[in-house]
């Protein structure tokens, strides 16, 4: 009988990383590894790192060091780094952090079981030398689908040579290109990867260099994975990628998302479909119409504004201004008055003036956003912005970050108060003795946004869609009272 091998996956960063972790979990379980929840109970602790900004990289290093500490007094024998930080730095990370017994890039994912076994046996798998993954796919989007078969794209394709009899609950059951995937929690919400990579050239962002050029998954693959997730009890799927508004451009149809969304909404068992990561400059009337008028599609707009002062946006290699952004929001709300909108912003960008900051504050005040993320600028190596002059002192960036963060906190609390009296459709996500029943309405995405606190959990169950009336707020969170007969009909859920 083969020796029992255990592995734990520790996931940091965004929802895309969560999908990648479930792919790794699926590959490992298919090859006989036993998944455990806690790293201290695992032979190998795999840390799926984030390489987005400095704070995220620090969190990733801390998680690796914490896992390494387990080797002295527990079952853990090896610690392995995967994910964006591992891909971005490769050999450099391995040399700087000897506590990690292995640093694996995206090209290692299809052979993750063999890689971990080698490391567990005391062997060494040489870390890769990082390369610009944008160069792995053709410049022309039309040529990428055929070339993509030879490029590692986490979350896109099934590995070769899988055993015919996969363990129960392990994808794919719904098509040859659905990714091998094992859910790591019992949440009624799951992310589905719509695409990978990004063709935008924002001057502050390094993500395209290690995630590559934009490439869409085929609609049949996305539908197949969504059906499988519904069979696992998922009620809400959130479509993720670096830029969902570009979906289909490499498949010959830039409006493919408008066609796909109604099909996803018709999947049996799915109560809500949410779209994240939308670019304001790529929004189009047809997409707004589908997002605001299709049953079971959340009227939710995760718009990447980043700033609103024209000079700063130009330096960021982005487009728009305060008035155009406000006009976009007016268009959305004219079609769906209760639509949810969230965005992230960078303050202290090189060359940002007090007038620029005031313009951003004007936009934030007028935008009535439901959730706001604010980040202070810091150089990211390999980016155009890192070469800019006119850098602001760190204390100036910190002061502006604190100033805009305070304003953002006030504004999202005000926006929550505006929702008092509204009727919302809430997916119940957890029920416990301490917090009671908690869920999320259409305008609230997992992790990043607020939530709904029910006044009573009586009769509620996790995964149930409930109609409730907002009766109060706690900061950005809503307090809501379930309405009598509040099980929402699936045809109405999401509207």
Curated annotation (Swiss-Prot):
Origin superkingdom: Bacteria
Binding-site list for [4Fe-4S] cluster 1: 14, 50, 84
GO CC annotation, single: cytosol
Cofactor(s) needed for function: [4Fe-4S] cluster
GO molecular function annotation: 4 iron, 4 sulfur cluster binding; aspartic acid methylthiotransferase activity; metal ion binding; protein methylthiotransferase activity
Key words of the record: 4Fe-4S, Cytoplasm, Iron, Iron-sulfur, Metal-binding, S-adenosyl-L-methionine, Transferase
SMART domains with a match to the protein in the record: Elp3 (SM00729)
Cofactor note: Binds 2 [4Fe-4S] clusters. One cluster is coordinated with 3 cysteines and an exchangeable S-adenosyl-L-methionine.
Positions of the MTTase N-terminal domain: 5-121
Subcellular location field: Cytoplasm
Function of the molecule: Catalyzes the methylthiolation of an aspartic acid residue of ribosomal protein uS12.
Record-given protein name: Ribosomal protein uS12 methylthiotransferase RimO
Organism, scientific name: Streptomyces avermitilis (strain ATCC 31267 / DSM 46492 / JCM 5070 / NBRC 14893 / NCIMB 12804 / NRRL 8165 / MA-4680)
